[in-house]
Amino acid sequence: MAKQIFYTLFLFLLSTAILTASSSAPRAAITSKRAINFIQASCKATTYPTVCVNSLTGYANSIQTSPRRLAETALNVTVTQAQSTKVFVWRLGRFTSLKKREIQAVKDCIEEIHDAVDRLTMSIHEVKMCGSAKGRDQFWFHMSNAQTWTSAALTNANTCSDGFAGRVMDGRVKNSVRARILNLGRGTSNALALINAFAKKY
């Protein structure tokens, strides 16, 4: 008798678990689809929409349909990209075969990227503060800071790239660095566009 009761209870719990799993799966799929659609629509406002979609779609479940989380995620992705670029340029600077001008350009670029990382990190903080701002004035104070820091980070990326311009620079060094910086600049530009779009939603 006890075994029969236990078996019946087991079947009941198992069927409940299956029903719960089967009902939550479509909901998760719908949520993810809505989030992806939101990301795709939002990225149309950026200068590099394909880069925007490809870099942010993987975070759809955390972004959902929040303009603030979208901007914040774009900044986080760009910070990671900037840190990776900084390491790449630093390793490049350790090559003894570099010319004197190339060595100086690498050093200057590392400083620019370091500043970009700091400014993007501060921008992330400001965007977060926008989410808890009390009143219009407080929101725009943090928003203005976020826009300023991100714009400055974009300038840092462009300044680094300019240091490798001209025919004097070695083709391999110039091309490898500028390709990385180009991608960083695009990510930063997109993040700034999404911050501006978030501001318009307020």
Swiss-Prot record:
Main location (coarse class)? secreted
According to the record, the segments passing through the membrane are: none
Q: Report the InterPro entries cross-referenced here.
A: Invertase/methylesterase_inhib, Pectinesterase_inhib_dom, PME_Inhibitor
> Residues of the signal sequence?
1-21
Q: Please provide one cellular component term from the Gene Ontology annotations of this protein.
A: apoplast
Location in the cell reads: Secreted, Extracellular space, Apoplast
Tell me what induces its expression. Induced in leaves during infection by Botrytis cinerea.
Q: What GO molecular function annotation could you give as one example from this UniProt entry? A: pectinesterase inhibitor activity
Keyword Transferase (UniProt): no
> Per the UniProt entry, what are the Gene Ontology biological process annotations, in alphabetical order?
plant-type cell wall organization or biogenesis
Q: What residues are glycosylation sites in this protein?
A: N76
Keywords from the UniProt entry: Apoplast, Disulfide bond, Glycoprotein, Secreted, Signal
Q: Which cysteines are joined by disulfide bonds?
A: C43-C52, C109-C160
Phenotype of the disrupted gene, per the record: No visible phenotype under normal growth conditions, but mutant plants have enhanced susceptibility to infection by the necrotrophic pathogen Botrytis cinerea.
Q: What's this protein's family per the entry?
A: Belongs to the PMEI family.
Job description of the protein:
Pectin methylesterase (PME) inhibitor involved in the maintenance of cell wall integrity in response to necrotrophic pathogens. Modulates PME activity and pectin methylesterification during infection by Botrytis cinerea and contributes to resistance against the pathogen.
Q: What is this protein called?
A: Pectinesterase inhibitor 11
Native organism: Arabidopsis thaliana (Mouse-ear cress)
Q: What's the gene?
A: PMEI11
